[in-house]
Amino acid sequence: MHQHIQVPPLEGKSRINYVNLPLINGDKLRTAKTLVDKAIKEKKVFSVQGPYPVIRAGLRARGWVERRLPRPSFSQPRRHDHETETTDEGDSSDEDDLGEEVERDDEAEDLYDLMSRLVRHETPYFYWTTRRDSVDCRSLRKEQMTNHYAKAGSFTTKVGLCMHLRNLQWFDAADPDTFFPRCYRLGAQDEKHAFIDDFRRTACTSLLLYVLEKYEGDSEGEKMGEVHNAKSHGLRKTRKQHSSQRIETSVIDSALHVCQEYLNSLEHCDIDNNLETNSTISEQQWKVFLQNYYLVVHEGINIEGCEYYLERCKCMLEQMRQVCPQMENDGICNIWIIKPGAKSRGRGIMCMNKLDDMLGLVDGDHCIMKDSKWVVQKYIERPLLVHDTKFDVRQWFLVTDWNPLTVWFYRECYLRFSTQPYSTHTLDSSVHLCNNSIQKHYQPSPDRSPSLPAECMWSCSQFRSWLAASGRAALWKAVVVPGMQKAVIQTLLTAQDSVEPRKASFELYGADFMLGRDLRPWLLEINASPTMAPSTGVTARLCPAVQEDTLRVVLDRRSERNTDTGGFQLIYKQAAVDVPQYVGVNLLIEGTSIRRPRAPVHKSLIQSHPEPLSKSTNHKSSLLSSPCTSGKENQSEEVKRACPNLPNRKITMDQSLIFHPKRKRPHRLVLPSTCCVLPNPTELHHPQRLSHTQPQSDRPHTHRTRSNLPTLYRPTPSVEVINIRPRQALTSSHYIHKIHTVNLSYPVLRMQQNHRRSKNTFAEREGPKSS
């Protein structure tokens, strides 16, 4: 212990306090060194941020030594005030956890202080922190453990939960609308318009339900034998009657029309409707309808002759219930809850029931609108009530691995009650928000049932006893618990690809549920770092047990697989997916060189040349020509002027080939005679006139250009004959004679060639034979 000795001040000098440092006991020092050496050898050094006396005590009992982190100065502005303005992932707070400090044992604390000083330069292998960003997971070794996963905001934030649950259809055959109230981001324009449509459609169904319940009463709840007969909550309040004012029945017709159009859209019947028959309600008509709806539901103004619409309203509501699983919770007041995504612990949450007020509130905050932080969610207007008081359920679950996904569900939970009786005619947070951080600022209302505790909490065992008194004890295990487990698993499946699956990490979460009148659980949100403050007698018993059982799962079970896990039970474990082994980057490009494409094979023996050919030497050896573009009017006129009208002609090519297979070199192709008779050029534009001529031979030929073949050097199409060869090899010299006849449209051109040439002349042209 530090001893402060006060010395009487001398004259003219101020008083000075002298501090005597305590003497270190040798036995205590040796004990500390022994424990520290063993902990360092076994890698059992931990660090805890915040009080958490249960975590510290549990780790010390297992032989761990704490390396204490520097404590923040309370004289400085608290860091969490800034952080919680930018995140809504958890509901834990250092201020709530201050009450966790247990009575100190001075002797033990001195030993722990000494051991902490001895390991001040050692590496902690276990981190337990309140906030995720207190430890950089990327800089941790693979054997270092921490109680947070990186990038878990995909389901622990209001925006992330709203977005990821929409992808549930890709992971499970389930509809998120069956366990999560429909939710929209008002910062996204498409979702904002979807919310407006949803609000208007809900107003229509609420109006029909109002008409039905006003004249028939809420007999459906009595038929179902519900725990609490919430008979027309929207009609309980005594409202001022406006006997002189009446609303026309056209408002009911509009509501029926909107509901029918919605049903048609689900059946895709609206696709066949023409634009002329499309009777979409205009914005002005919607404005008038909502004003009438507010007057009827909120002000109590009667609808003239609405009793004649009871059967139609009942029939339409039955059809809507089949396609809208949340219709039983919607009620008649059309209340929505607005949550600013940058705050947690119930701060900034408001309940509203008018569309213009909600849009005006969101549009006024441009910063939050820019980041899409505002979230609007349908309020559950008809929850299960205990003694006419609203409550929600806090349920813990633990994730120890994301690949494969491993989920542990805690067997016990607790209920948080409101301090005020439930009513939909007041939108005060003390009635509709059950967060302990909000309700602790209010005193229980004298109108609330005295059967409820003043600390506004029940354990799950107390709730089961209340259900048993109503004859519904079996529904806890048959409906409530399976529904909560299913909602947790399906939510984690949608976020699995977004979270970094670090093997040595784990995280404890707190899920908030509400129960419908049929005891079906509805997921509200999931909190990271749930508060462990012993604020009431219920949490003083449950929170330490949850922390101790968490250490059993994440530490004791690693060394002993069959160890007791306390209140945690394994509810889900995926099949393991093998991660490909990383062997480094080895980039290799394989392929072949690109070959030069071959020239296309020309099957036609006669081609047209639309442009004049040059007399240069290049054109003398060129036998290929471009296609004729005689389809153009200007070119056809030129052809008519250049060529007079001539009768139909034909071209006959008499070809002779001489082959000597016994010799080393084959003889060249010779053309004994060629006779060209060209037809009228005007008939080129009418190919059907030439159909009476002989068809061109379909015999395949292999074309190869030769310099000695005839070419018509004219400014008009020419004739080209290429490499005519026999089909089979000849055993001796044979003379082959072929005649090809084709139609042309030019004057007669006659070319004479010798039928045979002497061997000497042929040899001279071929040059000397190669040896």
Swiss-Prot record:
**Which positions does UniProt annotate for Mg(2+) 2 binding?**
525, 527
Residues the record lists as binding Mg(2+) 1:
512, 525
* Bias type Acidic residues, positions: 86-106
Where does the record place Polar residues bias? 614-633
Residue ranges of every copy of the TTL domain listed in the record: 220-566
Task: Indicate the annotated site residue(s) for Essential for specifying initiation versus elongation step of the polyglycylase activity.
Answer: 345
Q: Gene deleted: what happens?
A: Shortening and loss of cilia in several organs, including the Kupffer's vesicle and olfactory placode.
The cross-references to SUPFAM superfamilies, in alphabetical order and at most eight, read: Glutathione synthetase ATP-binding domain-like
Q: InterPro entries in the record, alphabetically?
A: TTL/TTLL_fam, TTLL_monoglycylase
Q: Identify the residues that bind L-glutamate.
A: 437
Q: Which reaction equation describes what this protein catalyses? A: L-glutamyl-[protein] + glycine + ATP = glycyl-L-glutamyl-[protein] + ADP + phosphate + H(+)
Q: Which residues are involved in binding ATP?
A: 339, 345-346, 377-380, 390-392, 434-435, 525
Region annotated Disordered, chain positions: 70-106, 605-640, 682-713
Q: Which GO terms describe its cellular component?
A: axoneme; cilium; microtubule; microtubule cytoskeleton; sperm flagellum
Return the EC number.
6.3.2.-
Domain of life (superkingdom): Eukaryota
Cofactor(s) needed, names only, are:
Mg(2+)
UniProt KW Membrane keyword = no
Q: Which UniProt keywords apply?
A: ATP-binding, Cell projection, Cilium, Cytoplasm, Cytoskeleton, Flagellum, Ligase, Magnesium, Metal-binding, Microtubule, Nucleotide-binding
Q: Which residues bind a protein?
A: 345
Entry note about domains: Two conserved structural elements specific among monoglycylases, IS1 and IS2, are involved in glycyl chains initiation. Two conserved structural interfaces likely constitute the binding platforms for tubulin tail and microtubule. Arg-345 is the main determinant for regioselectivity, which segregates between initiases and elongases in all tubulin--tyrosine ligase family. A glutamine residue at this position is found in elongases TTLL6, TTLL9, TTLL11, TTLL13, TTLL10 and favors glutamate-chain elongation, whereas an arginine residue is found in initiases TTLL2, TTLL4, TTLL5, TTLL3, TTLL8 and favors initiation.
Function summary: Monoglycylase which modifies alpha- and beta-tubulin, adding a single glycine on the gamma-carboxyl groups of specific glutamate residues to generate monoglycine side chains within the C-terminal tail of tubulin. Not involved in elongation step of the polyglycylation reaction. Preferentially glycylates a beta-tail peptide over the alpha-tail, although shifts its preference toward alpha-tail as beta-tail glutamylation increases. Competes with polyglutamylases for modification site on beta-tubulin substrate, thereby creating an anticorrelation between glycylation and glutamylation reactions.
Indicate what this protein is called per its UniProt record: Tubulin monoglycylase TTLL3
Q: Which organism is it from?
A: Danio rerio (Zebrafish)
